[in-house]
Amino acid sequence: MANCSDLSFYDQDYFDRGCQSGKSNYVDYSWERIGGEVEKTAVHIIKHFAPAKSLDVGCAKGFIVKALYDRGVDAYGIDASEYAILKVPEEVSDRVKLGLASDLTYKSNEFDLVTIFDVLEHIPEELTDQTCAELLRISSNWVLVYVVTRHEPDDIDPTHINIKPREWWEAKFVELGGKICSINDIYNPNIWWFNLADRLIRVKK
C-alpha cells in the first residue's frame, strides 16, 4: 500500500486481520493461503508480457515478486508498509524495499513491466499526477494497473480515498504521455488482478 497519511496503519491488523479489525478487506494475507492464486497471476503475466525485469509497486509482502522471480524474471518490489516488508519471503527479501509510489527511487526506463495492483485508490488525489508520472518514468514498455473504480458496499477499507472511474485513470495516463491499450487479450475472470475489466488498465509507455 502507499501514501496513507499514517503509514503505520498498514500493520499486521491491516494485512492479516483486516476484516476482524475493520481496517481492510484482507483475511490472512499469507503465502500459504493465497500463494497458489498469485502463482497463476505470475504465469499469466509472463505469458502476455514476458518481462525481463519487473517492478511491483505496492507489493505488500512481495508475493508477486516471489512468483515472478521463481519463474526466471528479474523481479523487484516496493511498498510503504514496514510490517509487510518484514514479511517478504526470504528468497526475495533483498529485492523488495520500503518506499512510496509517488517517489520511486529507480532509474528512468529501468523496468520493462511495472505493475501496480490495488494501490492507486490509496493515493491522495493531489499526488495522483506525480505517482502516475513516476510509473511511466521508470517503465520502458508497460504499466499494468488494477485499481478500485467504484464504491462497493462491502469495502470497509478507510484508506480507499481516491476512487475514480476507469476512464478517469485512463485519461490521466494519456495526459502524462501513456497510451491506453486493449485488455481483451489479458482479461481473465479466473486470474487475480485480471478478473475485473472495469479495474484493469494496460498502459504502453
Q: What does each model-found stretch correspond to?
A:
Residues 1-108, 115, 127-132, 149, ...:
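Conserved N-terminal segment of class I S-adenosyl-L-methionine
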Residues 113-119:
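A short beta-strand submotif of the Rossmann-like class I SAM-dependent methyltransferase core
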Residues 122-123:
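A short His-aromatic
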Residues 135:
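Class I S-adenosylmethionine-dependent transferase superfamily signal
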Residues 140-149:
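Conserved beta-strand signature within the Rossmann-like core of class I S-adenosyl-L-methionine
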Residues 176-178:
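A structural motif corresponding to the C-terminal end of an alpha-helix
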Residues 204-205:
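C-terminal lobe and adjacent flexible extensions of AdoMet/dcAdoMet transferase-like proteins
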